[in-house]
């Protein structure tokens, strides 16, 4: 195993640890593509964790500087400051793919702002956040998952990322409240007459369910729009993207089956993932 192979393996371990659903799906890509996904995922994870986990603004600055070095001089040797193994893997990807570096910087800017979290006044602010933390990831992955990326390809990948982030929010309402965060907008909380603290303490009510389903309907519509345009991605990537997205959309039904609980994180079990795998395998005859 070469040193570069070890770098990609390290990135893969990060992805498997933090997103079993993504790993389950994207590990089925051809080798070069899946390695690129591992590297990009690992970079995005380190960006996300720099503040939330490490509480280290300097580490986030180092990540940004390392990415800028790769963008400016992709073929030069660099003394990376953040995580050398991840950055070497990213540099290798950047030498072969047209990486949308600005999307990395947009993600970093969102993480900077997230240090001083305040509730969103409107849904427009919430959806802007979903772009910043996840739509950006879709943009960065676009050259890996398509043969000839176009404006439409970037738009579809961006919308998929935003949809998956909204599903994360719908899954983690209670966990986020424990961490003193409410991502639903004040505008929509007022409209549906919902107080998350009250729901957390006293249990789910019809107002909360209506609010939750309002956002779920948005995520489901975006998911369907992506599925309707999935052919913008490469033939190899189409079944993989559909598998990852369908595993994620299944989370919404898991929340429903758990009676919208705020006190337990739901997940899609291996049996259901395997069922989705076989359904999509039959559809595409490829995986």
Curated annotation (Swiss-Prot):
Protein residues bound to (2E,6E)-farnesyl diphosphate 1: 18-21, 41, 45, 171, 248
Gene3D superfamilies: Farnesyl Diphosphate Synthase
Pathway listed: Carotenoid biosynthesis; staphyloxanthin biosynthesis; staphyloxanthin from farnesyl diphosphate: step 1/5
Domain of life: Bacteria
Co-factor note (free text): Binds 2 Mg(2+) ions per subunit.
Positions contributing to (2E,6E)-farnesyl diphosphate 2 binding: 45, 165
Binding site for Mg(2+) 1: 48, 52
EC number: 2.5.1.96
GO biological process, one term: carotenoid biosynthetic process
Cofactor: Mg(2+)
Amino-acid positions noted as binding Mg(2+) 2 in the UniProt annotation, renumbered to this chain: 168, 172
Miscellaneous: CrtM is not functional in a C(40) pathway, however independent mutations on Phe-26, Trp-38 or Glu-180 are sufficient to permit the synthesis of C(40) carotenoids, such as lycopene and 3,4,3',4'-tetrahydrolycopene, although there is a decrease in the synthesis of C(30) compounds. The combination of mutations at Phe-26 and Trp-38 appears to be harmful for the general performance of the enzyme.
Protein family: Belongs to the phytoene/squalene synthase family. CrtM subfamily.
Stated name of the protein: 4,4'-diapophytoene synthase
Native source organism of the sequence: Staphylococcus aureus (strain NCTC 8325 / PS 47)
Gene (name only): crtM
